[in-house]
Regions:
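Basic/aromatic-enriched alpha-helical hairpins
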Residues: 1-47
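Conserved tyrosine-mediated DNA breakage-rejoining catalytic core shared by Y-recombinases
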Residues: 89, 98, 134-173
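C-terminal catalytic core of Y-nucleophile DNA break-rejoin enzymes
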Residues: 155-174, 180-200
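Hydrophobic (often cysteine-bearing) scaffold residues that line and stabilize catalytic clefts
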Residues: 2, 6-9, 32, 53, ...
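N-terminal DNA-binding recognition helix of tyrosine site-specific recombinases/integrases
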Residues: 9-19, 45-80, 130, 200
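Short, basic (Lys/Arg/His-rich) helix/loop patches that form interaction surfaces
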Residues: 108-109, 178-188, 196-233
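Short, charged phosphate-coordinating catalytic segments
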Residues: 66-77, 122-145, 232
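Basic, Lys/Arg- and aromatic-enriched nucleic-acid-binding interface segment
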Residues: 51, 55-59, 74, 78-129, ...
Length: 233
């Protein structure tokens, strides 16, 4: 959280000073706009930080500087004239190319692979995390049309919803058959664990959109259903 971010920024500054200024420390009065811009450049060029990460770190530094100013240790604002803003990543869904990238990406271990597969399952079914977690095998039914369907009550809304399974989710169900307990379809890790791993996977795939189940469901409504000719109700 916040503490970790502050510690990371302090560590980056400790590396930045000898790297850029060939010194271990710097008096507060020497902080100026050049220092701020040099530090930003260091984060981008040396630490390979992305725009939004850089923005987050600079906010932390700005806060540290404002504490020094409020304490009377710094008579001026070195951030005056500094401009930086986050990249807009409010698209909130994945494109078809991104879905394919995600499905093709090699995962570093079985847990990452499971979390990726569950996310993809949500992308193709529109189910929330809690619905994927609570999905049991008795909810899977083959109808007269020969298709496999999920017959389920959505936990959030308590409404019944029937979802026809496309090939991708069918393959994912097959892959984890018999690995979950108590009649569940999937052995689902905790929500916190999934979020942490999804963040990792998103970074690995180079996505700007942060992977969350909200994004998975939005992707289902915008990218998947439209490309498979399913009307959005």
């Amino acid at each position: 959280g916040t503490f970790t971010r502050y510690r990371t920024v302090c560590n980056h500054i400790r590396e930045f000073l000898p790297h850029t200024y060939k010194r271990e420390d710097i008096p507060l009065k020497e902080l100026n706009l050049t220092f701020i811009n040099d530090f930003e450049y260091f984060l981008r060029a040396e630490k390979k930080c992305r725009t939004n990460t850089v923005w987050g770190y600079m906010i932390v530094l700005k806060h540290i500087v404002s504490i020094a100013r409020n304490n009377g240790r710094l008579p001026f604002n070195p951030f005056a004239g500094y401009i930086n803003s986050p990249e807009s990543v409010d698209r909130g869904y994945l494109t078809q190319t991104e879905i394919q990238t995600l499905m093709d990406a090699p995962m570093k271990n079985a847990t990452h692979e499971l979390v990726r597969d569950l996310f993809v399952f949500s992308v193709f079914t529109g189910l929330a995390y809690s619905d994927v977690k609570n999905l049991t095998t008795d909810r899977l039914q083959t109808f007269f049309d020969g298709n496999l369907w999920i017959i389920t009550r959505r936990k959030k809304t308590n409404t019944e919803s029937n979802i026809r399974l496309l090939d991708v989710p069918k393959r994912i169900i097959e892959k984890y058959k018999g690995l979950a307990r108590n009649g569940h379809v999937f052995p689902v890790p905790s929500n916190g664990s999934c979020n942490k791993i999804l963040k990792d996977i998103g970074r690995q795939c180079g996505f700007k959109v942060r992977l969350t189940y909200h994004v998975a469901r939005h992707t289902n409504a915008t990218t998947v259903l439209l490309s498979h000719g399913v009307p959005i109700e």
